[in-house]
A protein has these predicted regions:
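Short strand-turn motif at the edge of the Rossmann-like AdoMet-binding core
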Residues: 116, 197-199, 224
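Conserved PLP-anchoring active-site segment centered on the Schiff-base-forming lysine
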Residues: 85, 103-125
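Active-site phosphate-binding strand-loop segment of PLP-dependent enzymes
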Residues: 139-204
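Short beta->alpha connector loops at strand-helix junctions that form conserved
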Residues: 115, 131-140
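Conserved active-site segment immediately N-terminal to the catalytic lysine
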Residues: 206-225
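N-terminal small-domain helix-loop-helix segment of the aminotransferase-like
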Residues: 2-92
Length: 225
């Protein structure tokens, strides 16, 4: 295995601690605890009382996440009939992508990736010797996803179709009609879909998820960052 340099981190890291205003990162300034209580409506005294009785005993706990947290995560997919048992808590979105790609792809499979995309989506599969096919979004086509090109990139050996929505880094968003078409293409080839939805929910209107369409091989990845 030979992993490529992670370009965005190589570019960001040298200046990250020096910049007064960082326009190259997706993270926002963290709340103070006072701000967090005001935004959530949580009673501060009740929260602190819970903390007093919380055990600090170290144990592995629930390997895939606490039932309470998983139920909360399932709640952000109201149209997808997502249940807590469908949710896996992991160490960040990058870790989730790695688990899916490394866990699903085997020799003889191919991996179809819509690009531009987050670099790990295509470089991890390349690094383990998986044929990685790129469907390139084009500026002259307003970065619209050509469904015919996506279908043409797939065949009987396509195990996984990967995309970001909203797109990272260009911000183009696919809505219900386009996502439904992607699901139908995946069904045609019995392929999994990995949709990195890190920026889903950036506005007040409901933004559809790849898991809204009842396809059991659709995987949504998200994170707090």
């Amino acid at each position: 295995m030979k992993l490529a340099w992670f370009g965005v981190e190589e570019w960001l890291n040298p200046m990250d601690s020096l910049a007064k205003i960082n326009l190259g990162s997706s993270c926002v300034k963290a709340f103070t605890m006072d701000e967090l209580f005001r935004v959530t409506g949580q009673d501060e005294q009740a929260f602190l009382k819970d903390m007093e009785t919380m055990s600090l005993h170290y144990h592995h706990g629930d390997a895939t996440g606490s039932p309470r947290v998983k139920a909360a995560v399932a709640g952000i997919y109201p149209k997808g009939d997502v249940k807590p048992e469908h949710v896996m808590m992991v160490h960040g979105g990058t870790g989730a992508n790695d688990i899916v790609i490394m866990g699903l792809l085997e020799p003889g499979d191919n991996h179809v990736v819509v690009k531009p995309s987050y670099q790990q989506h295509y470089d991890i599969s390349k690094s383990i010797g998986i044929e990685t096919r790129i469907v390139q979004l084009k500026e002259e086509e307003d970065y619209k996803l050509d469904m015919n090109a996506l279908r043409a990139a797939c065949d009987k050996n396509t195990k996984l179709i990967t995309l970001t929505n909203p797109n990272n880094p260009i911000g183009i968003t696919l809505y219900e009609k386009e996502l439904a078409q992607i699901v139908e293409i995946a069904k045609e080839f019995d392929a999994y879909i990995l949709c990195d939805e890190m920026y889903r929910g950036m506005d007040e209107t409901y933004m559809p998820s790849i898991v809204d369409f009842g396809y059991e091989k659709a995987i949504s990845v998200s994170s707090l960052s």
